[in-house]
Amino acid sequence: MMRRRKVILLTIVVILIIIGFKMLFYFHVDPSSEEFTNVDLCPACYGRDLCPQFFHGDISLLGISKLRYLKSSKNVFLGKLSNNRVVLKKLAHDSEIANMDKLLCDKANLSPCDVKDAVKILIHKHLEIPDSFHFKNLIKTLDSSTDITRCPSERLITYLQDQLNMKRKLIDFEDVGSHGLGELMYGLLLNPEGIILQAFSQAEGWPFPQYLGSCGRVIVEEYVGKTISYYEDSPWKQRVDIAYQLLLIAQMLTENDSGFSLYMTDVNMDNFAVRSDGTVLLVDVESVVIVDRFNLKKDQNFLNKRHHSKGQFCKDCLNFSFDDLCNHSQSDHNYYAICKGLLVPESYYSPKGFLHEIPENVNTQTNLSVLVQECANPSTLFNRFRVVPKILQIMKSLL
């Protein structure tokens, strides 16, 4: 009798183990599969340059990212590439991706929907128009709502296309013509992060994560580190270093030699991260408005003057006007976003302010708290442009 019970118990254990392995296999996410990358849907995708690494098993997922039903709602996965930690992003919710596919098929009058053919139809239709291919107009007809398309210009579109094509040629990427345009269109419409990381690359000094490549509907970028929310109660020296870099980021995006101003429309504390060497980077670049300053100067009707952000906030959000950003040669928006949004007490993403508890001796010698408040709530128009360089100089002297 006891022997029979042992056999039954052992059988049950074996069955449970088999079921467990099957369930683990079912719930397991395989990054090398077409189901994960959707590379078969290109050119309705972000690119294909990193596909060999995916298909050869050089990219693996870490932790709960391995499990199908515990994935991030935004489709963000932690992984490894050549023993380096990386972040894999599909850059949208599943529902957003499905809605974009439907939009593209509807615009191409394609039913049943085959989104890769829809993209080819839309691109070829515009390529066939002699001497009048205006990619900007194509984007407009598709009712894009991404921030990067809010202030469109032919120079910006050409710049983005040239940057992506140049990087494809460096890796001997095939069909950089209509196929590349399809990928550019798809990224601009759904989420332009991959495009921005390539066009404004870290190698050229921009404060963004390194873009490592893409396969289908997945991009891969470097894992930077913990977000700045982790450092909110760190020692003063470390916090002032981070604040200094945040203002440098705001300054570079606003005032640079590219002819483009990049305005951050989402500056919450989880959108900035700190590398192991202490470097601060903007790690979520989906919400960036790009203004072509050169193009504006050619327009006789544009407002050839600076724009002042008034700082009218709603709870936990940044209140601004796309028209104001698009139609002025320069705005203090980035300074307003960092100072009012993160640094001062009662900022909307840091109630006590990232620069809380400034040492008394520092305040006495530098008047830093007053200057940061002036950046957040200026007493005169455009004073942020005058006060930010002073703040940066003081912070640099404290490091």
Would you name each region that the model predicts?
Residues 119-194, 198, 206-249, 292-294:
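Conserved structural core of kinase catalytic domains
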Residues 232-268, 275:
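Conserved alphaE helix
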Residues 258-329:
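Catalytic activation segment of kinase domains across protein kinase-like and atypical kinase folds
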Residues 83-86, 92-96, 216-218, 225-226, ...:
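Conserved beta-strand elements of beta-rich interaction domains across eukaryotes
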Residues 6-84, 90-143, 177-189:
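Juxta-kinase regulatory segment immediately upstream of eukaryotic protein kinase catalytic domains
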Residues 86, 207, 219, 281-284:
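Protein kinase-like catalytic core scaffold
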Residues 197-202, 212, 247-254, 283, ...:
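Amphipathic alpha-helical interaction motifs in eukaryotic regulatory proteins
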Residues 2-43, 312-399:
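Helical subdomain adjoining the active site within ATP-dependent kinase catalytic cores
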